[in-house]
């Protein structure tokens, strides 16, 4: 086990081999598709919606549509008509199993399905993976989570998941560690390193990334993709509700396990924040790409692979 987080780690540069950072390639392959960057907006109702999913797919960025008040049939039909990748989320309730049945009967097989529950190391997830595989075979790429241990990663892979999502409660609007005493909040990067030792398939680092440099750190410690909420929230195009405070425009950002998303105050493990509106989403993507190109140049390579080999230090200022 490794008790450190993003702010505790600094990566060490290697000799630069490019003349310009623009030469560095940030693309990543997940399943059958290659995407421009190893980042994906969190599948939260205040971060992603159908319009943004279409925009991201058209620009060759990965996305995962959230599962709240969502018509999967019409969405997948629309994406297939547009010849874009379809990527949806499911839970593990009875209606989710029925939805998989319906999609199969209609021959609407999504390219990606993310099984998305707070504690993903569970029999219910095993049953859902098996159900999807029985109905859809290998036609869809299954991402399962969320988990926090190497044993969980091994089990999900053994059950048939193509990738695992690592991170229990490290997100900015997640209060799992406060409500339950459990989770990876405060040591999320260590959890990625720990879990990656057991993984034979891709890991998606989910939560706890606060600045662009955390993407490179996630890759260094074993992540293939990074799921990010707060950095992608509160853009002009974001689905969060607009709120004006003292003539300043904010957007709501809340956790999937918050009472605001659930519509009831039961088993709450999320909260709501207001974030100042930060401009166009594609401007943030562009800045992330440039920063990640810089990371690759500091790593001494031309692709993301170079970051995986760099040395690092654990800072003396670390709380651990």
From Swiss-Prot:
The record lists the catalysed reaction(s) as: IMP + NH4(+) + NADP(+) = GMP + NADPH + 2 H(+)
* SUPFAM superfamilies for this protein: Inosine monophosphate dehydrogenase (IMPDH)
rRNA-binding among the record's keywords? no
Biological processes, Gene Ontology terms: purine nucleotide metabolic process
Annotated keywords: NADP, Oxidoreductase
Tell me which EC number(s) this protein carries: 1.7.1.7
Q: Which GO terms describe its cellular component?
A: cytosol; GMP reductase complex
Q: Where does NADP(+) bind?
A: 203-226
Q: Which InterPro entries match?
A: Aldolase_TIM (IPR013785), GMP_reductase (IPR050139), GuaC_type_2 (IPR005994), IMP_DH/GMP_Rdtase_CS (IPR015875), IMP_DH_GMPRt (IPR001093)
- The active site is formed by 174 (thioimidate intermediate)
Assigned protein family: Belongs to the IMPDH/GMPR family. GuaC type 2 subfamily.
Function description: Catalyzes the irreversible NADPH-dependent deamination of GMP to IMP. It functions in the conversion of nucleobase, nucleoside and nucleotide derivatives of G to A nucleotides, and in maintaining the intracellular balance of A and G nucleotides.
Q: What NCBIfam families does the record point to?
A: GMP_reduct_2, PRK05458.1
Annotated protein name in UniProt: GMP reductase
């Amino acid at each position: 086990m490794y008790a450190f987080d993003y702010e505790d780690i600094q990566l060490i540069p290697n000799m630069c081999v490019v003349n310009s950072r623009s030469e560095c390639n940030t693309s990543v392959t997940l399943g059958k598709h290659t995407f421009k960057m190893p980042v994906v907006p969190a599948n939260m109702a205040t971060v992603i919606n159908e319009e943004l999913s279409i925009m991201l797919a058209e620009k060759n960025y990965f996305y995962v549509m959230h599962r709240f008040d969502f018509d999967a049939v019409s969405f997948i039909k629309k994406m297939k008509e547009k010849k874009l990748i379809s990527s949806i989320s499911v839970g593990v309730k009875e209606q989710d199993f029925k939805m998989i049945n319906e999609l199969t009967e209609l021959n609407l097989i999504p390219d990606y399905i993310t099984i998305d529950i707070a504690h993903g190391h569970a029999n219910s997830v095993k049953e859902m993976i098996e159900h999807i595989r029985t109905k859809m075979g290998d036609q869809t790429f299954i991402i399962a989570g969320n988990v926090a241990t190497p044993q969980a990663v091994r089990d999900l892979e053994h059950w048939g998941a193509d990738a695992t999502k690592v991170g229990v409660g490290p997100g900015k609007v997640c209060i799992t560690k406060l409500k339950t005493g459990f989770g990876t909040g405060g040591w999320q990067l260590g959890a990625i390193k720990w879990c990656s030792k057991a993984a034979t398939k891709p890991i998606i680092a989910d939560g706890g990334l606060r600045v662009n440099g955390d993407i490179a750190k996630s890759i260094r410690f074993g992540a293939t993709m990074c799921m990010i909420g707060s950095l992608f929230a509160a853009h002009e195009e974001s689905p969060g509700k607009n709120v004006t405070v003292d003539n300043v425009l904010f957007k709501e950002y809340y956790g999937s396990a918050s009472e605001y998303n659930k519509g009831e105050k039961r088993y709450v493990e999320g909260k709501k924040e207001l974030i100042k509106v930060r401009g166009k989403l594609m401007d943030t993507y562009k800045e992330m790409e440039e920063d990640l190109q810089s990371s690759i140049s500091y790593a001494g390579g031309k692709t993301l692979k170079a970051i995986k080999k760099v040395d690092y230090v654990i800072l003396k200022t670390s709380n651990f």
